[in-house]
Amino acid sequence: MSGKAKARRAAMFFRGCSEDASGSTSGSTLLSEDENPDTNGVTRSWKIILSTMFTLTFLLVGLLSHQWLKETEVPQKSRQLYAIIAEYGSRLYKYQARLRMPKEQLELLKKESQTLENNFHKILLLIEQIDVLKALLRDMKDGTDNNHSWNTHGDPVEDPDHTEVLDEEMSNLVNYVLKKLREDQVQMADYALKSAGASIIEAGTSESYKNNKAKLYWHGISFLNHEMPPDIILQPDVYPGNCWAFPGSQGHTLIKLATKIIPTAVTMEHISEKVSPSGNISSAPKEFSVYGITKKCEGEEIFLGQFIYNKTGTTVQTFELQHAVSEYLLCVKLNIFSNWGHPKYTCLYRFRVHGTPGKHI
């Protein structure tokens, strides 16, 4: 082979190698350029995923924080709200309690004040009558010659000793009138008087009338009750509303007396129509009977009498027992059969028992 042929072959060899090298280089370059879009896409996907997870985590933390704040703040606000509602509720019920004061009580106060005023005028009138009586007696004294002495000039001279006697007589008369005014009308001992030791036996007594208007309420719960107990009938304080009421027109009560007595009479008392807030006394008892109980209030019932309380009569009415007994009794039972027309209840103000006490208590 000649030298030119070798040189030509070598040049071709090196040319092919350079082309292969350049081709591989360009291929690798193209490959890397083809691979770059895939790498960039993966990176963007991860960024999106991470940002989404971060956002979700942030939102979740915020939601949990908001829920926790609600759970801590709302109960406190609720308690404050309930406290405010309770306070205003109590004020409202207090106001309602004041407004719930029945008009009857206001009328009752007016009636009582009017009664006191009338009594005051009666006392003033009585004092005036006493003064007139004094003047008349003195005029009678001055009109008698025996009550005067004459001086030398013919002028009458009043006898001081006689004047003192007359003043003493007038003073005794005034004291007698005042004593009669203070004395009880019945003028008999009351052995059913609570202050003397008498009492009501609840087991033998009817239930009291339940009057919702006589109660005060707070949040729907009654906490004050103005109903009168049965033993109010054993006390001398008789004024409108101060009575024991039982439902309907029939009821009974068992009274343990202050001491053993042989009963002879009973007294029933009610208020007058003039001082009644309603203008009538239809709740007053009408027909009633009285029994004596032997053996410590648990024995046989002994009939003592049946009577009628007259509402048009005096307020204090005494009844002599129709059946006399010879043994001493400690308990008396009062049975009421009817009233004077009230449809809901009967009201008993005072009941007294009179008689002869035993020698030993």
From Swiss-Prot:
Residues 103-129 form a coiled coil. Residues 22-31 have a biased composition (Low complexity). It holds the Pfam family Sad1_UNC. Residues 197-358 form the SUN domain. One of its GO terms (cellular component) is meiotic nuclear membrane microtubule tethering complex. One of its GO terms (molecular function) is protein-membrane adaptor activity. Residues 1-47 are nuclear. InterPro entries: SUN1-5, SUN_dom. The chain crosses the membrane at residues 48-69. Its main location: membrane. Gene3D superfamilies: Galactose-binding domain-like. PANTHER family: SAD1/UNC-84-LIKE PROTEIN-RELATED (PTHR12911), SUN DOMAIN-CONTAINING PROTEIN 3 (PTHR12911:SF24). Self-associates. Interacts with SYNE1 and SPAG4/SUN4. Proposed to form a spermatogenesis-specific LINC complex with SYNE1 during sperm head formation possibly implicating a SUN domain-based heterotrimer with SPAG4/SUN4 associating with SYNE1. As a probable component of the LINC (LInker of Nucleoskeleton and Cytoskeleton) complex, involved in the connection between the nuclear lamina and the cytoskeleton. The nucleocytoplasmic interactions established by the LINC complex play an important role in the transmission of mechanical forces across the nuclear envelope and in nuclear movement and positioning. May be involved in nuclear remodeling during sperm head formation in spermatogenesis. A probable SUN3:SYNE1 LINC complex may tether spermatid nuclei to posterior cytoskeletal structures such as the manchette. This is SUN domain-containing protein 3. It comes from Macaca fascicularis. The lineage of its organism: Eukaryota, Metazoa, Chordata, Craniata, Vertebrata.
